[in-house]
Structure formats: structure tokens, C-alpha cells
Amino acid sequence: MAGHSKWANIKHKKAAADAKRGKIWTRLIKEITVAAKLGGGDPDSNPRLRLSMDKAMDANMPKDNIQRAIQRGVGGLEGVNYEEIRYEGYGLSGAAIIVDCLTDNRTRTVAEVRHAFSKHGGNMGTEGSVAFMFTHCGQFLFAPGTPEDKLMDAALEAGADDVVTNDDGSIEVTCPPNDFSAVKAALEGAGFKAEVADVVMKPQNEVSFSGDDAAKMQKLLDALENLDDVQEVFTNAVIED
């Protein structure tokens, strides 16, 4: 058993994302464009593109929007050139934060990220200052009540690295990032649909926040998430209910 409010934290993040669907679409279009540019327009041979397309379909994005983003990425349509940048920093009590961005203006982005950190009690670190505290992996989270033994058998057979039951009853499955699509397909084929499935930077240790500190930490994370150039925010902070 591990973790204590994983389910609540994931549900909060998912609800916040659903509430900003228009912004989610914009982020996904950028991600699809970059994925197609870097790895080609065939999702069968481009795992990153497959993942971003799956996310777009889960977000009910029209297929035409997805195809236009792919065409833009492979050079079939005019569009903005985006650059991938990762920023690292700290929140309250030294909580580690990773901010992944896609931007057409590095100067603007770093200024906005730095401002969000400083305004909400955090500070930016140097490259590599917190990334070592995280593991790059595929992550699946299943609702409390999912049959643990059957899920474990299916996950390990599919190529998962680990299956952990959290204190709240949710079950977390992790796998190598390059195997994410195959493991996801195998789990769904076995009848297991994850509530949340993504390739993430998973914290190796967590820092819990409650009361006023939890509210302050959440404001920092929200401020970073709300920046237009930010694609993903990862943290080892656990916000208690």
C-alpha cells in the first residue's frame, strides 16, 4: 500500500482540466503538431503522436482538427514553429515542480513562468535541479474497487513495471514510457479502463500540504497551469482535502 490521497489529487486535476476544455484543445493541437513534426504523421510508428491523438479524442476534439494539426506538423500546412522547453523550480517547503512548455517565444515564456513562481511563494531552479526526483513513465490510475488481483495479472502480462494499491483503494500501474500505448491497449482489451492514463514525470517521493499551505501551493500550481505556453506541470506536492 502506498500514497494517501492519490485519487483525490488526480480527480481534482482531471476536473480542473475538464473545466478548461478550450485550453486543453489548444494544448493538444500544439502537442500533435510538434509530435508529427519530430516523428512523422503515422501514429503507428510515432508513439508520441499516438498518445496525443488519444488524448485529443478523449477530449472530444473533432477529427478534422486533429488531421490539420498533423498536416501542419509534417509541413503540409503553414503554422507556428514551437520549441520545447522544460523549467524546474520549487514551491512551498521545497516541493519540486517541473513545467513543460511549447512556445514560439522563449523570452516571453521564461518571464511568465518566473513571475508565476515568484508571485506565489516559489522560485525557479536551474536545469536538472529537481528532474532527478522524478521518473519518466507511463501511468494508469484505476478507481477504488477495481479487482486488484485480476488487474495485476493483466498489467504484468501487458508489460507493466509495477502495480501499487494506494491507501485510498485506487490502483496505480506504471510502465516504460515507450510501452505506454501497447500496455494501454492490452489493459483495455482485458476489460480495464483507467480513469487517468498518461506519460508523466512521476515523483519518487511526495510532500504533503494541508490547510493554508495547501491553498497556497494549489494557487502556484494553478498559476503555472494557466499559462498559455505551459503544456504540463508535474510536482511531488500532495494537496490534502
Swiss-Prot record:
One GO location term (cellular component):
cytosol
Enumerate the subcellular locations listed in this protein's record, separating them with semicolons. Cytoplasm
> Where does this protein chiefly localize?
cytoplasm
Entry keywords, A to Z? Cytoplasm, DNA-binding, Transcription, Transcription regulation
Which GO biological process annotations does it have?
regulation of DNA-templated transcription
Q: Which InterPro entries match?
A: Integrase-like_N, TACO1_YebC-like_2nd/3rd_dom, TACO1_YebC_N, Transcrip_reg_TACO1-like, Transcrip_reg_TACO1-like_dom3, YebC-like
Q: Which GO terms describe its molecular function?
A: DNA binding
Which family is this sequence assigned to? Belongs to the TACO1 family.
- Give the matching NCBIfam families: PRK00110.1, PRK12378.1, YebC/PmpR family DNA-binding transcriptional regulator
Q: Cross-referenced PANTHER family, in alphabetical order? A: TRANSCRIPTIONAL REGULATORY PROTEIN YEBC-RELATED (PTHR12532:SF6), TRANSLATIONAL ACTIVATOR OF CYTOCHROME C OXIDASE 1 (PTHR12532)
This chain belongs to which protein, by name? Probable transcriptional regulatory protein RALTA_A0859
Originating organism: Cupriavidus taiwanensis (strain DSM 17343 / BCRC 17206 / CCUG 44338 / CIP 107171 / LMG 19424 / R1) (Ralstonia taiwanensis (strain LMG 19424))
